[in-house]
Design a protein with these regions (language model features):
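N-terminal helix-loop segment corresponding to the beta1-alpha1 unit
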Residues: 1-213
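Active-site-adjacent beta-strand anchor residues
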Residues: 18, 85, 107, 222-225, ...
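Glycine-rich beta-alpha junction loops
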Residues: 46, 135-137, 224-229, 266, ...
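Short, surface-exposed loop/helix-turn segments at secondary-structure junctions
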Residues: 52-60, 238-247
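Short Gly/Pro-enriched turn/cap motifs at secondary-structure boundaries
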Residues: 63-64, 72, 249-254, 260-261
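Oxidoreductase and adenylate-handling cofactor-binding alpha/beta cores
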Residues: 182-201, 217-218, 230, 234-242, ...
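Aromatic-enriched alpha-helical interface/lid elements that frame and gate functional surfaces
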Residues: 255-315
Length: 315
C-alpha cells in the first residue's frame, strides 16, 4: 500500500475511474490501485456508494447517524473521490472530461445503463479499457436482469454444492462471486493494458507492426456467474464425460479422508486434512494410533475415501 500511495508500483501512471457500486467493480478498481494505479471514485451526489450504508458501523464522535461503515472503510480506501450525477447533462460532460484523462473505467450497472446515459464504450475514447461487471454478462437472454452476488453463486452452481447433503443449499460466508469476479476483471484489465501499450493484443497498434496504427482499448465483459463456473473443479467435466451430477458433501469429500472440522475439548473446532498417505501416517502417530496405517480400510487414499465415515469417526 505504501508503494501505491506514493504512486509507485507496476501500474504507476495508469488512471482508473471507479464508477461502480457495492463490491465487485470497486474491488476491481481497488486491486488496480494496490498495484500503483491512480483510482478516482465517482459517486452520485447525496447518496454515494451503497457500501457507505452497509454495516457494521463505527460511531463517529460529534456526528449523528449510524457512524462510519467498515464495509466502506475496507473497499472504499486507496482512491480519490468526486461526485457526479451521470444522469444529468452537466454530469455526463464532467464524466467524459474525467475519462479523457483515464486508462480504465470500472462499472457494474445493469447492462445497458451506461449506454442509456450516453456513456457506453462507443461514447468514450477508443483506447479505454472498459471493465463491465454484471450477474449474467452483457449479452444473452438474461443480460438485462438485475442481481447481486447471491444470484451469481446460484446461477454459477456453487450454491448447490455448499452445505450438508441432507440440508438446503447454504450461502458461503462471504460474497464470493463479487470478490472473485473483481479479481478476474482486474487480471483482464491488466492484460488489456499490456495488449494496448505493448501491442500484442487485438488493438496493438504501432507496437504490433503497424506504424500508422493507434493503440486500441478493450471492453471486458465479466459476469459473476462465469467466475463461479471457472472454480467448480471437475464439476462440469464430470457431468459432460461421466454424467455425474455433483451434490453437496458438507465438510467432507467422497474421495479424501480424513478431512473435516472436528470438535475440540474447549468447545471449538479444529480443521484436520490428512489425505495423503504420508500425512495420514503423521496424523496416526500424533493420535498415538499408528496401527491405523495397517488397517485395510485405511491403507491408501482410495481405501480411506471408501471408508471416510469410519476414519472420520475415529479421528
Amino acid at each position: 500500500m505504501s508503494d501505491a500511495a506514493a504512486g509507485a508500483g507496476p501500474l504507476a501512471g495508469i488512471r482508473v475511474i471507479d464508477v461502480g457500486t457495492r463490491i465487485s467493480a470497486p474491488f476491481c478498481a481497488g486491486l488496480l490501485g494496490e498495484l500503483g494505479a491512480d483510482v478516482i471514485k465517482v459517486e452520485l451526489p447525496g447518496e454515494g456508494d451503497f457500501m457507505r450504508t452497509m454495516g457494521p458501523f463505527v460511531p463517529v464522535e460529534g456526528e449523528g447517524g449510524a457512524g462510519y461503515s467498515l464495509s466502506w472503510a475496507v473497499e472504499g480506501r486507496g482512491r480519490r473521490g468526486v461526485t457526479c450525477d451521470l444522469r444529468q447533462p452537466e454530469g455526463k460532460e464532467l464524466f467524459k472530461r474525467l475519462v479523457a484523462t483515464a486508462d480504465v473505467v470500472c462499472e457494474n450497472f445493469r447492462p445497458g445503463t451506461m449506454e442509456r446515459w450516453g456513456l457506453g464504450p462507443d461514447d468514450l475514447p477508443s483506447d479505454l479499457v472498459f471493465v463491465r461487471i454484471s450477474v449474467f454478462g452483457q449479452s444473452g437472454p438474461y443480460a438485462p436482469r438485475p442481481g447481486l452476488d447471491r444470484l451469481g453463486i446460484a446461477f454459477g452452481g456453487l450454491l448447490n454444492l455448499t452445505g450438508e447433503p441432507d440440508r438446503p443449499p447454504v450461502r458461503p460466508g462471504v460474497t464470493v462471486s463479487d470478490y472473485l469476479t473483481g479479481v478476474f476483471a482486474a487480471f483482464a484489465a491488466v492484460s488489456a493494458l499490456y495488449g494496448r501499450d505493448v501491442g500484442r493484443g487485438p488493438g496493438g497498434g504501432a507496437a504490433n507492426g503497424d506504424p500508422d496504427g493507434e493503440p486500441g482499448g478493450e471492453v471486458i465483459d465479466a459476469p459473476l456467474y462465469a467466475s463461479i463456473l471457472r472454480i467448480l473443479e471437475w464439476t462440469l467435466a464430470g457431468y459432460d464425460t461421466l454424467g455425474i451430477v455433483r451434490q453437496r458433501e458438507g465438510n467432507r469429500l467422497a474421495h479424501s479422508a480424513p478431512l473435516d472440522n472436528y470438535p475440540t475439548g474447549d468447545g471449538s473446532y479444529i480443521c484436520i486434512v490428512a489425505g495423503s498417505d504420508a500425512n495420514f501416517a503423521r496424523l496416526c502417530a500424533a493420535m498415538e494410533r499408528p496401527e491405523l496405517t495397517e488397517d485395510p480400510r485405511f491403507v491408501n487414499l482410495a481405501a480411506r475415501g471408501a471408508h471416510g465415515g469410519d476414519i472420520n469417526g475415529i479421528v
